[in-house]
Amino acid sequence: MRAPQDDGERAERENGFAMKLYKKSDFPVADIRRFLEPGPVVLVSSAHKGERNIMTMGWHMVMEFTPALVGCVISSANYSFDLIRKSRECVINLPTTAMTDIVVGVGNTTGAEVDKFETFGLTALPAARVKAPLIAECHANFECRLADDALVDKYNFFIFEVVKAHVAPSPKHPETLHYTGEGVFMVSGKIISRRGMFRPELLDSI
């Protein structure tokens, strides 16, 4: 196979796929999150001993299906950190692009100074399994309990078990926000299905 002559030329692979080869330059390792952001930006609500708060979070990942485990990085400087660590629970709420300005506003304020539910006109609903409130305006709410705090002291990394999930029936694929740094978000795009190419046993395992 002849090597491509420049960045824009497509190379014919042995498997028949024609793919573009990209010419690359050095990139700051501290900024790789722009390409490896883990998922949609979420709003995390918490409550403890009469206090409640909401924080904006972009660093989270699904770790297991059953039980449903989610890992989250929550800075110790965040007002929510102590509320969540002491109560050992929270709610992960999924906003859509309709809430973009609220997502930014929540991230720009501290719960030590304002009640973010009141400040941003958000509706707090009682959860079924935890004391932290749901945010009614969000497309989905996932009630969480702290499952493992072994990495909290060293990495601010919480592992939660989702004990109850509430999801709006439509749209099936909501427009969510994905933070790339420097105040810029990407929006979830069109859906591409390759279901027919998957081995059946893998459809629910990855």
What kind of region is each of these model predictions?
Residues 4-13:
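A cross-taxon signal for low-complexity, glycine/charged-rich
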Residues 15-206:
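Basic, polyanion-binding surface patches
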